């Protein structure tokens, strides 16, 4: 039974992780800037083993006090959505740099750390599927769109250096498009947005020409992957992709959602320049290689895309399909 600290704990992935940790009889502290009210993903959680702390990872005194009392630390705090990254690149970078700075200064060898990185660090790397050891190609510094990827990659470098220099047990997971119940469509995630449009009976909007491809990982699979990495010491000091290898174009995704909800709905193609701020750049293909995590832990994703879409739809419609 471990004492676990989860930053970004009220978020989409964090709330699912916390539910699982509590089911496994761990004590959990969630740190998040979100207020504690009925819109919080954890509001209905009732457990004497759970504590919620409203605050920021940039509050060094608060964060360090929570670090020192934890056995396991899950660093999930991040800026969500490409639009928000472009609008606030400095805040985006600070969220990552601040928490890693305090981890490097405070963490001890008796603790274990999971860092939630992102497929964004692969940038413009034109290879498919993407393997963890590839050389990485990011966009030009003048494009604010790359602030998230650069700050996440810097955090990876610092944490892996911490492992090499001080032998702090840690692992890095690069998430690829995690989806599922509780995901907030306000941050621009494509599946909850398309499903919400379909439920409302309005045209489904696809940005660009729709040929860009992605793969989508159910949040329960992502939680399983995190725990499999944290529970296996042979994974320490390395980076692992976490995702699903089932690739689909965004246009075909919209077609699939239309067929699922209402085949009569229109699909509208919208140019990027009509909806995205200056500095946006699209990535045409992003699909993970999952061989490494399977080799080290035996983990592989269980949910197929059709199952994931149904699960998201049930959540959005109040469990009625």
Set out the residue ranges of the language-model regions.
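N-terminal Rossmann-like NAD(P)+-binding domain of SDR-like oxidoreductases, especially those catalyzing
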Residues: 1-176, 312-315
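Amphipathic terminal alpha-helices
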Residues: 3, 304-321
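Hydrophobic "lid"/C-terminal helical patch
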Residues: 17, 226-230, 254-257, 309-316
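Residue-level signal for the nucleotide or nucleotide-sugar donor/cofactor binding architecture
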Residues: 58, 87, 95-98, 185-189, ...
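Glycine/proline-rich active-site loop of Rossmann-fold NAD(P)-dependent oxidoreductases
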Residues: 153, 169, 178-192, 202, ...
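Conserved C-terminal active-site "lid" loop/helix of NAD(P)H-dependent oxidoreductases
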Residues: 219, 273-300, 304, 311
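Non-catalytic, hydrophobic alpha-helical segments
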Residues: 222, 226, 242, 253, ...
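Mid/C-terminal beta-alpha module of Rossmann-like enzyme folds, strongest
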Residues: 232-277
């Amino acid at each position: 039974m471990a004492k676990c600290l989860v930053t970004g704990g009220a978020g989409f992935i964090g709330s699912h992780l916390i539910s699982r940790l509590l089911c496994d009889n761990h004590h959990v502290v969630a740190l998040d800037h979100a207020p504690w009210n009925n819109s919080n993903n954890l509001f209905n959680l009732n457990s004497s083993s759970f504590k919620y702390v409203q605050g920021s990872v940039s509050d060094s005194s608060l964060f360090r006090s929570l670090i020192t009392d934890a056995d396991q630390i899950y660093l999930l705090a991040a800026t969500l959505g490409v639009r928000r990254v472009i609008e606030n690149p400095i805040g985006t970078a600070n969220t990552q740099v601040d928490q890693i700075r305090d981890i490097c200064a405070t963490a001890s060898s008796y603790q274990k750390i999971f860092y939630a990185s992102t497929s964004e660090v692969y940038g413009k790397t034109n290879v498919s599927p993407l393997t963890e050891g590839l050389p990485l190609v990011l966009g030009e510094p003048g494009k604010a769109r790359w602030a998230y990827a650069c700050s996440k990659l810097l955090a990876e470098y610092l944490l892996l250096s911490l492992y090499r220099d001080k032998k702090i047990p840690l692992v890095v997971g690069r998430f690829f498009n995690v989806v599922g119940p509780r995901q907030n469509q306000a941050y621009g995630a494509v599946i909850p947005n398309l499903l919400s449009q379909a439920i409302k009976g309005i045209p489904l909007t696809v940005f660009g020409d729709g040929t860009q491809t992605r793969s989508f990982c159910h949040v329960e699979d992502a939680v399983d992957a995190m725990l499999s990495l944290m529970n296996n010491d042979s994974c320490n000091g390395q980076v692992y992709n976490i995702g699903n290898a089932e690739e689909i174009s965004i246009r075909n995704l919209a077609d699939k959602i239309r067929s699922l909800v209402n085949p009569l709905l229109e699909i509208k193609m919208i140019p990027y320049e009509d909806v995205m701020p200056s500095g946006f750049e699209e990535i045409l293909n992003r699909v993970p290689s999952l061989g490494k995590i399977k080799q080290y832990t035996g983990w592989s994703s269980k949910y197929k895309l059709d199952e994931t879409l149904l699960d998201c739809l049930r959540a959005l419609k109040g469990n009625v399909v």
